Amino acid sequence: MTTQPHAEPPDRAHAQATGPADQLQDRHRDHARATPIQQPLLFVGGGNMAGAILRGGLAAGVIDASRVFVVEPDTAKHADLNQLGVRISASATDGVTWINSVDEVAGGQGQRDAANRAQVVLCVKPQMLPQAAADIRAAFASPRVVISILAGTPSSVVRRSLGEHARVVRAMPNLAASISQGVTAICLGDGASRDDDAVAHAIFRAVGPMVMRLEESKFDAFTAMAGSGPAYLFYLAQGMIEGGVRAGLSHEESNRATRQSLLGAAMLLSRSDQAPESLRAAVTSKGGTTAAAVGVLDQREALRAIADAIVAGAARGEELAKLASK
């Protein structure tokens, strides 16, 4: 099942007047009014993204630590998770026992109550899905919503792995969620029905100012563009630092200047209604230093290379999805 595209960024007038730092402050003010999610949450996987989601949700007041259980086989990760005040175990059996016990306390085992029962947040690596699904399948003896952030893994594959009672909401956050500046795509996936994504929307709204509801058919494109987007910027930063050193700066000087330049440019782009090419033209004087630099980028077809990279990433995502579906 799919939904129509829908984005929920700050409103246009507000976006013109404020930048990322201001938006972050506005979201912190909203945190004070946040209503905690009522459904208990079982996180399967306690890696970097799970930690980012938990930290953002806890800071926003959306997630209640006392209603969270994390299954993470790698005990080396437990120390960081313990600081969040959530229950943790290396055993999936413990997680299944916990989620079934909170269901018994809350009551409501029927299909119509699935959206209000404890939900599973699946945060393992895609190649770990078969084992993870086998470990928690007992939690899906009756209808339950599962939020999957597995890259390149269609919701139909997740449901097939967990059983017919799994109601899959697919989500794809990006790395900036770790500093509450992420952009996340979500969709109602296989077996899910209207309102099953309410908890997912609340969670990911807590770790970024934008949550986009997309058709699942667009997830590979979104992953290649926004999910992998931070990597492209880091790649650019790497080149800028190297160029600064070759031009005469020390590595420290070039590193510091690059980081602040990219941050400032991102904030300008966020605050402006102008297209990126218009902003670029505004700082590119004919015959000047920027024109000389951009000329080299144009000669090397840098714009085309970036666009081709995103298309290649999306194509790879489609390939991985086909492999996962076999």
Residue ranges and their predicted role:
Residues T2, H6, R27, R259-K326:
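NAD(P)-dependent Rossmann-like dehydrogenase/reductase catalytic/cofactor-binding core
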Residues T2-A115, Q119, G182, V245-A247:
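NAD(P)+-binding Rossmann beta1-loop-alpha1 motif at the extreme N-terminus of oxidoreductases
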Residues P40, R55, A59, A198, ...:
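Acidic, glycine/proline-rich low-complexity segments that act as flexible tails and inter-domain linkers
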Residues D64-V68, S142-R144, E252:
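Short acidic capping loops at alpha-helix termini that bridge into adjacent secondary structure
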Residues V157-R167, V183-A221, Y232-R271, R316:
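Internal alpha-helical scaffold of NAD(P)-dependent oxidoreductase catalytic cores
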Residues K218-A224, P276-A281:
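Short pre-catalytic strand/loop immediately N-terminal to key active-site residues, enriched for Gly-Thr
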Residues T75, L81-L84, S91-I186, D190:
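Rossmann-like NAD(P)(H) cofactor-binding subdomain of soluble oxidoreductases
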